[in-house]
């Protein structure tokens, strides 16, 4: 559920109302009209190294009386309102830039989802016909468009520091985000969606896709024994312990271990990856909601076909489908933790000496507060 606190806009309020808590404003502080209390709170939070966590659901009411109850929600609301220390402001997610990025890759016209898939029943069923050993055409296409691994640019000749590791991970995240945008352009059915929907889906799913990709690389290249962020950034347990995000590493480590346990095939992984892209949408839905539902149903059927390549029989196939979709569901809590950590690090990036590339900064500033406020489903 979205935050219960009133959503203010600068244009709609009297000039003396704090946009954070509704108290009387003392002026425009850090780019936003606020009271003295919220001004001081924001400055201390940004310059300190606090790791605020909400004890509730990240939807606490922030008003004059209760503004001190939950610093995590208060800080999130400051960020959501646009407060920036030292004039650090970011535009809304640059739709023009994304569209140019989408157009930058020379690819053939979008490949439609096969007619055979479109003609299948919307019900999820496991039939004997799925015993065919041939890889379905759409899954073959997913294999052909899978992006190459990208490098983090991390200098392994120097000792790890918290700021250097996080900066390298952010650089890697920027490159992977660009890779996701390019990959989505060649994904059958995706360009049939409204351009606003395409951008929204990428914004809401990028963290899930990156973590899922991390799990796959760790599974395939180091048998789930380490975290394989990139060929030049592989963390063994010792490096994880020495990092400032060891608990998050342990949580992320569970994904490749699940891949090992389930022995996930490449065909299954590719279908699950697309379903992650299509997993989170705004509460109000999408502009091309019907096309989105059709696309999602088609890729659910492709996952069933991928399962059928190795698993024979209705009952084992159904059990396998449950295990794989449960794995996707279990990503939700992990990704929420990563969103919180990412937003906190972003807000305090100057104090922590952590660099955030521009495109990644725009996504974080524009969408993470909405996701954490429960404005998606």
Curated annotation (Swiss-Prot):
Pfam families: Hormone_recep, zf-C4. Its main location: nucleus. The modification Phosphoserine is found at residue 127. SUPFAM superfamilies: Glucocorticoid receptor-like (DNA-binding domain), Nuclear receptor ligand-binding domain. GO terms for molecular function: DNA-binding transcription factor activity; sequence-specific DNA binding; steroid binding; zinc ion binding. Palmitoylated by ZDHHC7 and ZDHHC21. Palmitoylation is required for plasma membrane targeting and for rapid intracellular signaling via ERK and AKT kinases and cAMP generation. The keyword Phosphoprotein applies. Belongs to the nuclear hormone receptor family. NR3 subfamily. Composed of three domains: a modulating N-terminal domain, a DNA-binding domain and a C-terminal ligand-binding domain. The steroid hormones and their receptors are involved in the regulation of eukaryotic gene expression and affect cellular proliferation and differentiation in target tissues. Transcriptional activator of several progesteron-dependent promoters in a variety of cell types. Involved in activation of SRC-dependent MAPK signaling on hormone stimulation. This is Progesterone receptor. The gene is PGR.
């Amino acid at each position: 559920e979205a935050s219960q606190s009133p959503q203010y806009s600068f244009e709609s309020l009297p000039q003396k109302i704090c946009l954070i808590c509704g108290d009387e404003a003392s002026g425009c502080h850090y780019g936003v009209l606020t009271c003295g209390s919220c001004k001081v709170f924001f400055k201390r939070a940004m310059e300190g190294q606090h790791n605020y966590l909400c004890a509730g659901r990240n939807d606490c009411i922030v008003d004059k009386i209760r503004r001190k109850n939950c610093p995590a929600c208060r800080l999130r609301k400051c960020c959501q309102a646009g407060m920036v220390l030292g004039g650090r402001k970011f535009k809304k997610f640059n739709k023009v830039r994304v569209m140019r990025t989408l157009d930058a890759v020379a690819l053939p016209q979008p490949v439609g989802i096969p007619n055979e898939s479109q003609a299948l029943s919307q019900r999820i069923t496991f039939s004997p016909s799925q015993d065919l050993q041939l890889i379905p055409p759409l899954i073959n296409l997913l294999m052909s468009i899978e992006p190459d691994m990208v490098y983090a640019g991390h200098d392994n000749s120097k000792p790890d520091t918290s700021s250097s590791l996080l900066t390298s991970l952010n650089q890697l995240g920027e490159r992977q985000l660009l890779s996701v945008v390019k990959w989505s352009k060649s994904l059958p059915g995706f360009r049939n969606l409204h351009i606003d929907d395409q951008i929204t889906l990428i914004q809401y799913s990028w963290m899930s896709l990156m973590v899922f990709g991390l799990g796959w690389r760790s599974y395939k290249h180091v048998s789930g024994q380490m975290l394989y962020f990139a060929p030049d950034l592989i963390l063994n347990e010792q490096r994880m312990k020495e990092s400032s995000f060891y608990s998050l590493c342990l949580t992320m480590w569970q994904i490749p271990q699940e891949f090992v346990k389930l022995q996930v095939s490449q065909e299954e992984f590719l279908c699950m990856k697309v379903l992650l892209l299509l997993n989170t949408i705004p509460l109000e839905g999408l502009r091309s909601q019907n096309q989105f539902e059709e696309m999602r149903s088609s890729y659910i059927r492709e996952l069933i076909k991928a399962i059928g390549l190795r698993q024979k029989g209705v009952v084992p196939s159904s059990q396998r489908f449950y295990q794989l979709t449960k794995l996707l569901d279990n990503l939700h809590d992990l990704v929420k933790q990563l969103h919180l950590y990412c937003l906190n690090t972003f807000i305090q990036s100057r104090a922590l000496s952590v660099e955030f590339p521009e495109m990644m900064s725009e996504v974080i500033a524009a969408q993470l507060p909405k996701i954490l406020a429960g404005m998606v489903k």
